Each structure stands twice: as structure tokens, then as C-alpha cells.
Amino acid sequence: MSKTAIVVVDMLYDFIDGSLACCHAQEAVKAAKSAIERSVVDEPDYPVLFILDHHPSNHSSFKEFGGIWPAHCVMNTRGGEIHDDLKPFVRDDLCFYKGCEVTKEQYSGFEGVSDKGQSLNSCLQALGVKSVIVVGIATEYCVKATCMDLLINGFEVSVIADALAYVDIDGHLKTLEEFEKSGIIVQKKQ
């Protein structure tokens, strides 16, 4: 049996109830927590990796600096923190930060690095992971970019639809269709 991991994308307060709150976010957090709990109950060392948008306060993606987004997930603010319900599953060595450079917009978890400079891809490979279950926010942006990079890099990828939040329902549904066409498994009900 190939080793499986869960990747949690941007389940951060600004995307849940803050400046960029997404549709279905609270429900997605609950579904993600449930999926993680089911995975770790039999295997306490089950890998759960977290991707975090982690911006400096003057990030170029913010409207006030010429970008398209309101300020969000600023370093050392509540908005950039992982939801409390998921914090018990966080291991510092399995957190990957993206968007840390002022002039770089990064959507994919593959662009993030851990505190020790390790990439998501190298970490998954070091753990012997072959299959990845993705949950997170937002389906059309960071979840999509991360899933596509996982697929390109040879991982079997699935998403839990109930554990995804989104900016727009039409974009969410279109992305789920794209996932299925590309070979990503969309789990409709847990």
C-alpha cells in the first residue's frame, strides 16, 4: 500500500472569517478536521502538511500596493493563523509558507518552503508519500495550483469536496470538473 498524506491549504482565519472570507469556509474546516481525525486515529504519525499564505504587510498582491486582493494573511496577525480546530494537528516541520517575498505572488504549495527551507515536494518524497488528499481554501486558486503541481510531480491526488471553500460557486464547480478531467479524484461525500 502506498503511503498517503493530507495537505491542508490555507485554512487561515482571513480566508475563513476575515478580509478574504470564502464561501463554505466554516463547513470546510469542520470537514477537514473530521478527515484528519479519521486518518490519525489509527496512525498517529499520519502526515498532515499545512500550506500557509504568509505575507509581509506591504505585499504586492494587496490592492493598496497595486495588486488585486485586500490585505490578507499578514505575518504575525490573527488573519494569518491556522484555524484553532486544526492546530492540534500542526507540526512545525510540516508547515510550508508561501507569498513571503514582497514582490512574489504564490498560489501553489509547491512554491512554499518550511522554516528549514525544505519544499513541499521534497518533504513528501522524503516521507515516502505517493498519494495526497487535499483540503483547503480557495478551490479556484491555491487549492487548484497545489493539486495541479502535485499531479505534475507524479502524486496520486484526491480532494474532499466538502472540505473545500471557494471564492465563487461557479469557479469552484468548474475547478472540480477540471480536476476530474485531469485525473484528480473528487470525493463528493465523506
Language model features: what each stretch is:
Residues 24-25, 135-140:
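Short, glycine-rich nucleotide/cofactor-binding loops
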Residues 1-100, 155-156, 167-189:
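Active-site acidic carboxylates
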Residues 33-38, 141-152:
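Histidine-anchored nucleotide/phosphate-binding helix
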Residues 61-62, 106-109, 145, 170-171:
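Short, well-ordered secondary-structure micro-motifs
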Residues 133-136, 155-169:
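A short glycine-rich beta-strand->turn/loop micro-motif centered on a GG-aromatic cluster
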Residues 9, 53, 137-139, 162:
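Cofactor-binding loop segments of dinucleotide-utilizing enzymes, especially the Rossmann-like FAD-
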Residues 83-137:
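Internal catalytic-core helix/loop-beta-alpha segment
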